[in-house]
Design a protein with these regions (language model features):
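Phosphate/pyrophosphate-binding catalytic cores of soluble transferases and nucleic-acid-acting enzymes
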Residues: 1-142
């Protein structure tokens, strides 16, 4: 392995599989910082559905990727990748290890394959889809 090439570490898995406890243990033993890769944890106030680390755990190990945006705002993969790149770059400057932890497959895959920066959906299309949903429900969108 190239010593000059930084390494990212990953823990991924389904909800309630023990990722958080394993991540805390590994991060403490390996002097690492944790970057959350959870598409729900990025939102402020979404604490139950995302199993965010406790304040105590956050004081033991530096965490990133939590509470980045108000729940009523749009936060997409391109914003997450820009944020994650900044966190990783700064950590490497400090010679700190980064452990990426999460169960959001789409966000995790973005570390390994290219994604579209941003998909712009016109207001006309949004209105059309919304009208279809109101008229026919979810089955109309399938």
């Amino acid at each position: 392995m190239d010593k000059d090439c930084p390494t990212l570490y990953f823990i991924a898995g389904v909800t309630a599989s023990g990722k958080s406890a394993l991540a805390m243990d590994w991060a403490e033993k390996n002097n690492a910082e944790i970057l959350s890769c959870d598409s729900i944890a990025i939102y402020q106030g979404m604490n139950i559905g995302s199993a965010k680390p406790s304040i105590h755990d956050q004081s033991r190990v530096q965490h990133y990727g939590l509470d980045l945006e108000n729940v009523d705002k749009r936060y997409d993969i391109s914003k997450y990748l820009k944020y994650a790149k900044g966190v990783i770059t700064e950590a490497y400057k400090r010679k700190s290890r980064i452990l990426v932890v999460g169960g959001s497959g789409f966000y995790l895959r973005s570390f390994f394959s290219a994604v579209v920066d941003e998909v712009v959906v016109s207001k006309d299309i949004r209105k059309s889809v919304e009208a279809l949903y109101l008229d026919e429900g979810l089955t109309g969108l399938l």
